[in-house]
From Swiss-Prot:
<dbReference type="GO" id="GO:0050832">
    <property type="term" value="P:defense response to fungus"/>
</dbReference>
<comment type="function">
    <text>Exerts antifungal activity against F.oxysporum and M.arachidicola, with an IC(50) of 2 uM for the former fungus and 10 uM, respectively. Has weak mitogenic activity against murine splenocytes. Displays antiproliferative activity on a human hepatoma cell line and mouse leukemia cell lines. Inhibits human immunodeficiency virus-1 (HIV-1) reverse transcriptase.</text>
</comment>
<keyword id="KW-0929">Antimicrobial</keyword>
<dbReference type="GO" id="GO:0031640">
    <property type="term" value="P:killing of cells of another organism"/>
</dbReference>
<protein>
    <recommendedName>
        <fullName>Gymnin</fullName>
    </recommendedName>
</protein>
<keyword id="KW-0295">Fungicide</keyword>
Length: 10
């Protein structure tokens, strides 16, 4: 995933 998507997962 991209850096932006990681914020949503974690």
């Amino acid at each position: 995933k991209t850096c932006e998507n990681l914020a949503d997962d974690y």
